[in-house]
């Protein structure tokens, strides 16, 4: 079994999650949730594209702290025209630790805290391979 090395989560002086390995913040300093909604959800027209379908598949490279996933999950849950099943596929070479998933973003408080906690509870071991977790 090949264990994956987690990214060592650090924080920049303003309190935003930072990856020393990649020399970058995990999300916009203007707010991760707003960025995910504007760039990922709206930028890809996801709610319009998944409307009234039986199922819909999203592929994301670089899961990070899961903000795009969490924003998508929240939008899917709140959408009366959502597909019956949403498949969110993501790849990550250096997954964070489950406890890192529960850290609220500095500018959004705990808007996604319930979803973060559910994700952290089911977060798989850091071993190479395919991992499947299911919600809702």
Predicted regions and their residues:
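S-adenosyl-L-methionine
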Residues: 101-136
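Alpha-helix boundary/interfacial micro-motifs
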Residues: 31, 47, 79, 96, ...
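Conserved acidic E/D residue at the C-terminus of a beta-strand in Rossmann-like folds
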Residues: 89-95
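Class I SAM-dependent methyltransferase Rossmann-like catalytic core
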Residues: 2-56, 64-82
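Short, conserved acidic/polar surface loops in the N-terminal third of protein domains
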Residues: 70-73, 99-103
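Conserved beta-strand elements of the Class I
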Residues: 57-59, 89
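Short, solvent-exposed loop/turn segments at secondary-structure junctions
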Residues: 64, 95-96
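Residues at the starts of beta-strands that form the adenosine-phosphate
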Residues: 85-87
